[in-house]
UniProtKB/Swiss-Prot annotation:
Domain of life of the source: Bacteria
Gene Ontology molecular-function annotations: structural constituent of ribosome
Protein name: Large ribosomal subunit protein bL27
HAMAP family: Ribosomal_bL27 (MF_00539)
UniProt cross-references to PANTHER family, sorted A to Z: LARGE RIBOSOMAL SUBUNIT PROTEIN BL27M (PTHR15893:SF0), RIBOSOMAL PROTEIN L27 (PTHR15893)
Keywords, in A-Z order: Ribonucleoprotein, Ribosomal protein
Chain's gene name: rpmA
Propeptide segment residues: 1-9
One Gene Ontology term from the biological process aspect of the record: translation
Length: 94
């Protein structure tokens, strides 16, 4: 009697793959100047997505919602009502 010993091997090598190993670069959002700090006009005060903090006196809002100083002065973070915050820049009396 004839016995056949058949063994089947993989025709392709098993290649490992992963769904990990990627991450987006941080966007460096948040406060760039502190309360009471002196700033010049055009200085970035706060980088954000959406309006987490609103623009107050002498503060402009850029296309990406970045808040910047319009004049030279002192930064002041304030409450705007019960649940909102704003940042203003006040001129310093010389």
């Amino acid at each position: 009697m004839l016995k056949l010993n058949l063994q089947f091997f993989a025709s392709k090598k098993g290649v490992s793959s992963t769904k990990n190993g990627r991450d987006s670069e941080s966007k460096r959002l948040g406060a760039k100047r502190a309360d009471g700090q002196f700033v010049t006009g055009g200085s970035i005060l706060f980088r954000q997505r959406g309006t987490k903090i609103y623009a107050g006196e002498n503060v402009g809002r850029g296309g990406d919602d970045t808040l910047f100083a319009k004049i030279d002065g002192v930064v002041k973070f304030e409450r705007k009502g019960r649940d909102k915050k704003q940042v203003s820049v006040y001129a310093v009396a010389e």
